[in-house]
Amino acid sequence: RYTLLTSAIKTCNDNKVYLAQFFRVISQENSADIYQAAKDSDYYIGAVHEDEPANGEELVNILLNKGDRNIGLIGWEQGDATWLGRWEGYKAGVDKWNEEHPDDQAKLSEPQYAGTTSEGGSKAAEALMAADPNLDALIPAGGGGDPLQGAIAAVERAGKTADIDVVSTDFLPDLGDRLENGSMAGESGGHFCDPL
């Protein structure tokens, strides 16, 4: 099978140039031929990528360990692979918690989608707060931080900064201040190196 990545690997092999992939890892199971081409190359050195399910589970665990049980989800775009991976992790974290704590159950909202704007994040947070008066946590995901900023602003306008913990993967420039003043309760993220 000929793909953009197999073409890039071939070009690097032909020209003796090293190649690293960013953001996605080659699946040995789903893309066996591409994986093998990369493995056979002297010049393909690996990928740097996020483990979205692990990251999502970590965010949920931060909230559960803080005592939050009614978690609102704000996604980026419906069907986005990054969002779907994180959502898988959120669900896995809550499922594990509920199995281990049958008398202290947690729940996730259905996601509200914010797009990539602060206004979208604000509207999504407002909708979640209106739908669930017991909401005690929000996880805005994706969009490069703008939806997160909008969600934080909505929580602040509602006077609920002390009542609703906000965690995210998007690192804001003022993250330290936000963690200190309580407008954010935690952060999880990072990348992994995956050499073949």
Language-model regions, residue ranges each:
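Short beta-strand segments enriched in small/hydrophobic residues
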Residues: 1, 45-46, 70-79
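Short secondary-structure boundary segments
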Residues: 1, 24, 75, 142, ...
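Hydrophobic alpha-helical
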Residues: 1-15, 89-90, 107-178
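Flexible loop/hinge segments that line or gate small-molecule binding clefts
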Residues: 8-54, 58, 76, 172-180, ...
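Loop/turn elements at helix/coil->beta-strand transitions in domains of secreted/extracellular proteins
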Residues: 14-19, 42-44, 66-71, 97-108, ...
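Hydrophobic alpha-helical segments within soluble ligand-binding/sensing domains
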Residues: 46-72, 85, 120-125, 171-175, ...
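Glycine- and acidic-residue-enriched helix-capping/strand-helix junction motifs
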Residues: 79-88
